[in-house]
Design a protein with these regions (language model features):
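Pre-Walker A segment
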Residues: 66-67
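PLP-dependent class I/II
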Residues: 1-19, 27-61, 74, 78, ...
Length: 399
């Protein structure tokens, strides 16, 4: 007998991946340079030279038995210490290596965080629009995902919609700032209000409600925006991070979980992660890559192209009359479609070789996502196709 649950999931293939596959197939027909693929959030800039140099140096000058050997169950101590020191310096925290667990990307960090603070049957509350993979992450841990409807005017938290979803069975609240797909970063005021609410709700329900903060886009911030660090606002915070975007190394699958030193049972979180790894098979990430990122915590890829692309695309969308919130960061923008059915809108866009992702799977019907992590020249060239699309299908012309 096979696991029917996973077989059933075969019919729920990622919409993002489906549209990306359409782009690839269409590109084989007409040349990929003629397909304006805004589907997939894959970094489009190279990793920093320091990362390449670190890998080369480690491969050439480190004892291969050590370099390619197993790391400790709780991951590489020197990498954990370096991450803790970096976070302390940047955000005024007091982490030690004992509060850091290296993971296979932010997905691995989230898998561990959910199992650290919740037991099957409890619920996790998040906010639309949200990354669609949160649903299998949460349900795979035996939990229920509750989704707060979006506040579309600015994509900050609608507390009147959020509060009724939190009850005695809520284990954690899951946030993503800057957000995929909206690009919005939660303000300090929003985070303080969220922290105050969670303190009160924890007291009311008689147990700590954790905040799980998913932060893979932290370094991609625009216009000098300071992205507030959620763990500064709420003690019971587990931070989940990936280097995929900041270092442009998504295929290396490297990130970490950071447990706020003041959270409940802080000293137990990282050892618990070691035990969770045993149960899930989500064992330590590559020893080589742990050592490499340890040397690169103060650098990023050249992320400026994303802000350039965002400004170009935002101005074009506004000129075409789209309703759109200007992103604070990430490499996504999330406009309102020109009809209520965003799926139909995105299907029509494909006739003009535009690959756009409907917002339904992000918990926000009627909107669509554009991942502008592509060449700036291609962003500019896509405008002619976008203008033809909205003129032919909706009678909209550039203002």
């Amino acid at each position: 007998m096979i696991a029917q649950h996973y077989k059933d999931m075969l019919g729920a293939k990622s919409v993002i991946r489906q549209i990306s596959e359409w782009s690839t197939a269409r590109g084989a027909e007409i040349g990929y340079e003629n397909v304006f693929d805004y589907s997939l959030g894959n970094p489009s800039v190279p990793c920093p030279p320091q990362f390449t140099a670190a890998c080369e140096d480690l491969l050439q000058n480190t004892d291969p038995v050590t370099l390619h050997g197993y790391t400790p169950t709780l991951t590489l101590p020197s990498a954990r210490k370096a991450v803790a020191e970096s976070l302390n310096q940047r955000f005024g925290m007091d982490y030690t290596a004992d509060h850091i667990f290296m993971t296979s990307g932010a997905a691995g960090a989230l898998a561990h965080a959910l199992r650290c603070v919740a037991v099957p049957g409890q619920n996790i509350v998040t906010f639309a629009p949200f990354f669609p993979e949160y649903k299998p992450y949460v349900e795979g841990a035996g939990l229920t995902l509750r989704v707060t409807p979006p506040r579309c005017a600015d994509f900050q938290i609608d507390f009147s919609a959020f509060a009724p979803l939190v009850d005695e069975n809520t284990a954690a609240v899951l946030i993503n700032s800057p957000n995929n797909p909206s690009g919005t970063a939660y303000s300090a005021e929003t985070l303080q209000q969220l922290a105050d609410f969670l303190v009160e709700a924890s007291a009311r329900f008689g147990h700590h409600i954790f905040l799980i903060s998913d932060e893979p886009y932290r370094e991609i911030a625009f216009g000098g925006t300071a992205i507030p660090y959620p763990a500064k606002f709420y003690d019971d915070t587990l931070t989940c991070y990936s280097f995929s975007k900041s270092l442009s190394v998504p295929g290396e699958r490297i990130g970490y979980l950071a447990a706020n030193p003041r959270c409940e049972d802080a000293a137990a979180i990282v050892p618990m992660c070691g035990q969770i790894s045993r149960g899930t098979g989500h064992n330590c990430p590559s020893s080589l890559i742990q050592m490499a990122v340890e040397r690169c915590l103060a650098v990023t890829s050249d992320l400026s192209v994303y802000e350039t692309n965002m400004n170009l695309l935002y101005d074009e969308l506004c000129a075409l009359g789209f309703t759109v919130v200007k992103p604070d960061g990430t490499f996504y923008i999330f406009p309102k479609a020109l009809e209520e059915d965003a799926k139909a809108f995105c299907r029509k866009a494909q006739k003009y070789d535009l690959a756009l992702v409907p917002g339904d799977s992000f918990g926000c019907p009627g909107y669509f996502r554009m991942a502008y992590c592509i060449e700036t020249e291609k962003v500019r060239r896509s405008f002619a196709a976008l203008e033809r699309f909205v003129a032919a299908e909706y009678g909209v012309t550039k203002q």
